[in-house]
C-alpha cells in the first residue's frame, strides 16, 4: 500500500516537472517569436537616445558563420532592455565576413543602431579585446550570441557597478576548477553558473 502511494507521488512529481519544462519551452518559443517580429518590423532604435552614465555603456558580442542567422535574437533581447546601451557592437571575423554577406535582418538592425565591425579571428576574445582598445573608458558588457537576455540585465549590471565602481561585475560566471597538480581543468569541467 505504502509503495503504491510512494509510486504515485513520484509519478505526480515527474508530471509536474515535465509540465514546468513544457511551460519553459513555450515561454522561450514565445519570446523568440516576439524578438523575431521586433527585429523584422520595429523602427525603434536599439540603443539609448543619450548617455545615461558618466561613460558610455557598450554591449559587445561576436558570432561566426553557424550562428550568424540567429544572432539578431540576442541583439534584439538587448534592444528590449529597461536600460538600453549606448552602443551595441557585433564583431565579425574579417576573413569570414564582409558587409556584402551580412544577413538582411542584421542590416535592419544596423539601420536601428547596431554597429558591425571586423577584426581578426581571436575567437571569443573578439567580443572584448577590440572594444577595450577602442573604448577603454567605457562600461563594456559582453554577451553571448545564443542567449536571450532578461529585460532587466543591463539595469542590474549598471546598479551593481554603481555600488562597486572599482569591481568587474558579472551577470553569470563559471568557477575554474583545478586538478591534483593545481592546473586548470578543461573549461567543460568548471563549475557553471556560480
Q: Whereabouts are the PLM-identified features?
A:
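Conserved catalytic core of nucleotide-sugar-dependent glycosyltransferases
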Residues: 131, 148-194
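Active-site-proximal specificity loops/subdomain of glycosyltransferases
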Residues: 91-138
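Structural beta-sheet core signal
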Residues: 59-61, 90, 142
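Short acidic, S/G/P-rich loop/turn micro-motifs used as interaction or catalytic elements
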Residues: 64-68, 95-97, 147-148, 176
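Short, acidic, metal-binding catalytic loop of nucleotide-sugar glycosyltransferases
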Residues: 75-86, 94, 108
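N-proximal low-complexity "stem/linker" segments adjacent to membrane-targeting elements
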Residues: 2-80
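Short beta-strand-to-loop acidic/aromatic patch adjacent to the donor-nucleotide binding site
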Residues: 137-148
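Residues at the starts of beta-strands that form the adenosine-phosphate
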Residues: 56, 86-87, 139
Amino acid at each position: 500500500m505504502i509503495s503504491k502511494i510512494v509510486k504515485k507521488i513520484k509519478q505526480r512529481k515527474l508530471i509536474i516537472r515535465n509540465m514546468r519544462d513544457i511551460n519553459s519551452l513555450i515561454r522561450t518559443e514565445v519570446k523568440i517569436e516576439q524578438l523575431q517580429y521586433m527585429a523584422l518590423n520595429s523602427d525603434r532604435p536599439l540603443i539609448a537616445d543619450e548617455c545615461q552614465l558618466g561613460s558610455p555603456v557598450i554591449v559587445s558580442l561576436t558570432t561566426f558563420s553557424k550562428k550568424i542567422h540567429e544572432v539578431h535574437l540576442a541583439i534584439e533581447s538587448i534592444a528590449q532592455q529597461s536600460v538600453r546601451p549606448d552602443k551595441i557592437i557585433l564583431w565579425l571575423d574579417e576573413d569570414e565576413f564582409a558587409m556584402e554577406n551580412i544577413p538582411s535582418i542584421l542590416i535592419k538592425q544596423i539601420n536601428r543602431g547596431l554597429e558591425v565591425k571586423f577584426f581578426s579571428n581571436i575567437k571569443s576574445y573578439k567580443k572584448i579585446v577590440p572594444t577595450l582598445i577602442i573604448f577603454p573608458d567605457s562600461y563594456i558588457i559582453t554577451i553571448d550570441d545564443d542567449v536571450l537576455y532578461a529585460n532587466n540585465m543591463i539595469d542590474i549590471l549598471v546598479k551593481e557597478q554603481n555600488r562597486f565602481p572599482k569591481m568587474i561585475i558579472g551577470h553569470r560566471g563559471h568557477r575554474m576548477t583545478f586538478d591534483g597538480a593545481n592546473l586548470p581543468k578543461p573549461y567543460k569541467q568548471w563549475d557553471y553558473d556560480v
